[in-house]
Amino acid sequence: MNYQLHELFKAVGIHRQIVGKDLIIDSISCDSRHISKGGLFFGLPGEKVDGGIFWRKALASGAVAAVIGEEAAQKDPPSNEDMVFVVSDPVAHWMGEMASVFWKRPSSQIDLIGVTGTNGKTTTTYLIEHLCKQSGITSALFGTLYNRWPKHSEVAIHTTAFGDVLQSQLAQAVAAGARLGVMEISSHALDQRRVAGCSFSGAVFTNLTQDHLDYHESMEAYFQSKALLFQAPLLRDKESCSVVNIDDPWGLRLSKQLNKSCWRASLEKRVIDSIQPELFLTDLNITNKGIEGVLHSPFGQGPFVSSLIGRFNLMNMLEAVGILIQHGVSLQELLPSIKSFSGVPGRMEQIKVEGDLPVVLVDYAHTPDGLKNALIALRSFGSGRLFCVFGCGGDRDRSKRPLMGAIASKFADHVTLTSDNPRTEDPQQILNDVLPGIATETELIIEIDRANAIQMAIMKALPGDIVLIAGKGHENYQILGLETIEFDDREIAKKILHLKLNP
């Protein structure tokens, strides 16, 4: 892929005098370490370092030109002879827009659905991908676990990639024949303009609960970042569709700001603040084997059966079905496909070992709301005791730590407090931050070593008991200081279950 530099600038509305209008670029990157000869470098301001200060390194490595922000230009001013272009912030906006033009605006060539929210993004996107496959729609998935499209699958590095990579991925998916794409979009990605240049045909709001306040500083700022997905320029046009969870107070507020193309979703048929949901469920029967009921939409209703565990997963299912109906898929075609969806790795994933053993599940729940939903869901799973093994991540929102402790002690019969990804924080201090939330009468074990903590909980549990290992889910690593080690809750739990069965 090649593009004339002056034409690229012109296409996004940047008017600059460029000496040598025949300059050609063949790639776009925001990583000065990996910029290739003939590439266009974007220096993005970061939380710790402004990437714009590396423009000299990028040019020395063969970049045709560099695009940087005003602060970087003040720190290391380029001369008139340097092929450096200073743009207004956010620089990431211009990178996304130019990368989109460079790759021939790939998101405009498919139906692209964005899914945002604190919890439920991964399950909702996986459901959409599954339902597309069952309906014969060639799709692409971009998210926390994997990025995949026909004949391609790769482990994701970020929930949402930066614009230089994201637009390339979209172009590859389009070239591979994808007709519909579904993308997890984090609040960081929206705030940092990683999805600039994307054109979404639809958007889904799952919920908004406390998380990332170390980054956003307030729930209002967190909400405003999420809301960016539901307005121009990200939503394609006024007729672009959306599905919003109005059981969530932030979702209810968002729905009032949107047009008639927004479908409001609720788990019950009820009027909420004068709003009647377009999507809702009735006749629910929730058991430890799954859920069944009747799904209602503006295009009819019908029965469904799902193997997903927990009431909270119903909203993920309802919104996935709703957004696909809005994209022209028949409700009657979608309903039978719900039953065959087996779930997402690390999301209420049961560790299966044959024998007279406790039930052990691994879940990614790492927020107060996520942990509460998981524990409440497991109460219907059996009549035995409920064990909870959890910790809190280091270098992240500290205010949620005592809240997590309070929820664990309220909804579990036994709590094992341990490390999550401590990162550069003192693991003991993280546990100390959690402890004020845990009631004094709680049956509690404190064990910093996560593997030992998992073993202690499983060994203490009896057949008929349930052990929830929360926080890390699908992750196959643990971050200790600046080191990342191999660590998988699922593998450790399986090993301990075998040990318990054959001591």
Swiss-Prot record:
Main location: cytoplasm
Intervals of motif Meso-diaminopimelate recognition motif: 420-423
UniProt pathway: Cell wall biogenesis; peptidoglycan biosynthesis
Subcellular compartments: Cytoplasm
Record's keyword terms, sorted: ATP-binding, Cell cycle, Cell division, Cell shape, Cell wall biogenesis/degradation, Cytoplasm, Ligase, Magnesium, Nucleotide-binding, Peptidoglycan synthesis
Cellular component terms (Gene Ontology): cytoplasm
Enzyme Commission code: 6.3.2.13
Positions that bind UDP-N-acetyl-alpha-D-muramoyl-L-alanyl-D-glutamate: S32, T159, T160, S186, Q192, R194
Cofactor(s) the protein requires to work: Mg(2+)
Gene Ontology molecular function terms on file: ATP binding; magnesium ion binding; UDP-N-acetylmuramoylalanyl-D-glutamate-2,6-diaminopimelate ligase activity
EC class of the enzyme, as a word: ligase
Residues that hold meso-2,6-diaminopimelate according to the record: R396, D420, N421, P422, R423, G471, E475
Catalytic activity as recorded in UniProt: UDP-N-acetyl-alpha-D-muramoyl-L-alanyl-D-glutamate + meso-2,6-diaminopimelate + ATP = UDP-N-acetyl-alpha-D-muramoyl-L-alanyl-gamma-D-glutamyl-meso-2,6-diaminopimelate + ADP + phosphate + H(+)
N6-carboxylysine: residues carrying this PTM: K226
Database matches in InterPro entries: Mur-like_cat_sf (IPR036565), Mur_ligase_C (IPR004101), Mur_ligase_C_dom_sf (IPR036615), Mur_ligase_cen (IPR013221), Mur_ligase_N (IPR000713), MurE/MurF_N (IPR035911), UDP-N-AcMur-Glu-dNH2Pim_ligase (IPR005761)
Binding site for ATP: G117, T118, N119, G120, K121, T122, T123
Superkingdom of the source species: Bacteria
Biological processes per GO annotation: cell division; cell wall organization; peptidoglycan biosynthetic process; regulation of cell shape
Processing and modification events after translation: Carboxylation is probably crucial for Mg(2+) binding and, consequently, for the gamma-phosphate positioning of ATP.
Record family assignment: Belongs to the MurCDEF family. MurE subfamily.
Role: Catalyzes the addition of meso-diaminopimelic acid to the nucleotide precursor UDP-N-acetylmuramoyl-L-alanyl-D-glutamate (UMAG) in the biosynthesis of bacterial cell-wall peptidoglycan.
Name of protein: UDP-N-acetylmuramoyl-L-alanyl-D-glutamate--2,6-diaminopimelate ligase
Encoding gene, per UniProt annotation: murE
